């Protein structure tokens, strides 16, 4: 089980923390096709999810991310599972926590975009978006998540609501906020790495960074542009 020292090391700017890797890719490699709801596996095939967590743990991960990237109401509704938001997120966190056991390993509740456009780019209001994130995060907390990782966001308006939701469900829980960029080094909505860093910093994320979409060299170049404009710990 993680300890207060685990979180202290996690937030220490001089300490490198190693996360696990992709969950969906690993599940796909085990025969789960992409037309299925991967989040539902937390209750339908928990042993498969446990096996992925265990493999990352044995590889040396300091943090296990929950299998909950798409476990929000709008995305689950595409599979007729919108009534199971709390159940699937709670199960996701419990699975990761069970695999971590008594090891000094943290469990991060993984939260991805809603899959719908939020204002001003779409019909979903900011209040609605924040409510969807809150609902998901409550399930993750109930299952034992010790921090939140907001991943692969394209829209700064949306990730702001996710950060605000995290603070509403637990004012002290560590929050990692990560955007995605294209080969031009910009977010899909045109934000520069500097814009991203300043915004995520101002909204109170404890760790800020980038993930997905482009290779490590492009990510590194963008992270190097973020570093001078923030004192936050960086993730990639």
Segments (PLM) and residue ranges:
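Domain-level signal for soluble alpha/beta catalytic cores
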Residues: 1-236
């Amino acid at each position: 089980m993680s300890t207060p020292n685990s979180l202290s090391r996690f937030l220490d700017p001089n300490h490198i923390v190693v996360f696990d890797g992709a969950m969906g890719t690993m599940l796909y490699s085990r025969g789960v096709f992409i037309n299925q709801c991967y989040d539902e596996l937390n209750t339908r095939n928990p042993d498969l999810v446990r096996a992925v967590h265990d493999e990352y743990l044995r590889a040396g991960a300091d943090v296990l991310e929950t299998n909950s990237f798409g476990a929000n109401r709008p995305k689950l509704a595409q599979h007729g599972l919108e009534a199971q938001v709390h159940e699937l997120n709670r199960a996701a966190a419990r699975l990761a926590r069970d695999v971590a056991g008594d090891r000094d390993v943290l469990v991060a509740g993984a939260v991805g975009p809603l899959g719908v456009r939020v204002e001003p780019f779409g019909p979903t209001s900011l209040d609605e978006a924040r409510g969807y994130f809150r609902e998901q995060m409550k399930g993750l907390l109930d299952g034992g998540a010790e921090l939140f990782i907001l991943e692969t966001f394209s829209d700064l308006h949306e990730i702001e609501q996710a950060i605000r939701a995290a603070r509403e469900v637990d004012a002290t829980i560590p929050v990692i906020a990560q955007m995605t960029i294209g080969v031009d080094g910009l977010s899909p909505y045109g934000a520069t790495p500097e814009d991203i860093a300043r915004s995520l910093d101002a909204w109170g994320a404890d760790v800020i960074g980038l993930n997905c979409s482009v290779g490590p060299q492009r990510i590194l170049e963008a992270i190097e542009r973020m570093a001078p404009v923030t004192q936050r710990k960086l993730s990639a």
